[in-house]
């Protein structure tokens, strides 16, 4: 465990929470529970949000003005066109490995300064884990790391599996560790949310 859980209400502090796991493993659901249970409020941040916005903009630029499409905020559209996001993200990371984590870290200072916890909902790469841990340590921000699995949910592709394995190695060979690890059956959304609320209570966020 990187950060020891607080013992009493006097220790309530805004924290940085990293939710790690495969795509569709329940990370957003767990984050929803954490957000619902946060005493002083929490905001969710996703590495994928800038990628979705830029992908939407690229499609608009190509198909021309006046043509409507759902965009990557729409779940059905995202699922149907996930390959585009995967390849675009892979290309961007190959050019500049930390591009997405740097965008995310730039956006979290304001809510933390307002006393709100920040939950990064989609940590899947070892560099993301390490950069966030280093950022929190440098600023004295409590860091909590949560690893979630759902039975039957595996890596979307070989790159994700390789990088997730590296993430697990990084956590095992550094001081980061895991605050919580959980495994769920499919269809456990309500239970995952309850678990998130319970963790928020334990963390006193």
Question: For each of these PLM feature ranges, what is it?
Answer:
Residues 1-17:
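Extreme N-terminal, non-catalytic leader segments
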Residues 6, 23, 94, 99, ...:
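Small-molecule kinase domains that catalyze NTP-dependent phosphoryl transfer to phosphate-bearing small molecules
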Residues 20:
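Residues at the beta-strand->loop junction immediately N-terminal to the Walker
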Residues 28:
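Walker A/P-loop
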Residues 36-44:
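Post-Walker A helix-loop "phosphate-sensing" segment adjacent to the P-loop in P-loop NTPases
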Residues 49-118, 124:
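ATP-dependent small-molecule kinase phosphotransfer cores
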Residues 103-167:
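ATP-dependent NMP and nucleoside kinases share a basic, alpha-helical "lid"
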């Amino acid at each position: 465990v990187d950060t020891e859980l607080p013992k009493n209400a006097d220790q309530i502090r805004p924290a940085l929470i990293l939710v790690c796991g495969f795509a569709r493993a329940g990370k957003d659901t767990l984050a929803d529970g954490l957000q619902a249970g946060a005493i002083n409020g929490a905001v969710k941040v996703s590495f994928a949000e800038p990628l979705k916005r830029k992908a939407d903009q690229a499609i608009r630029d190509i198909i021309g003005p006046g043509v409507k499409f759902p965009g990557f905020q729409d779940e059905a559209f995202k699922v149907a066109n996930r390959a585009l996001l995967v390849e675009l993200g892979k290309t961007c990371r190959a050019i500049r490995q930390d591009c997405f984590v740097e965008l995310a870290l730039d956006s979290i200072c304001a809510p933390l300064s307002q006393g709100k916890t920040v939950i990064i909902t989609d940590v899947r790469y070892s560099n993301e884990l390490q950069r966030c841990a280093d950022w929190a340590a440098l600023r004295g921000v409590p860091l909590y790391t949560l690893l979630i699995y759902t039975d039957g949910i595996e890596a979307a592709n070989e790159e994700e599996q390789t990088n997730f394995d590296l993430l697990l190695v990084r956590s095992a060979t550094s001081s980061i560790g895991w605050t919580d690890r959980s495994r769920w059956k499919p269809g456990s959304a309500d239970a995952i949310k309850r678990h998130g609320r319970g963790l928020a209570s334990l963390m006193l966020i």
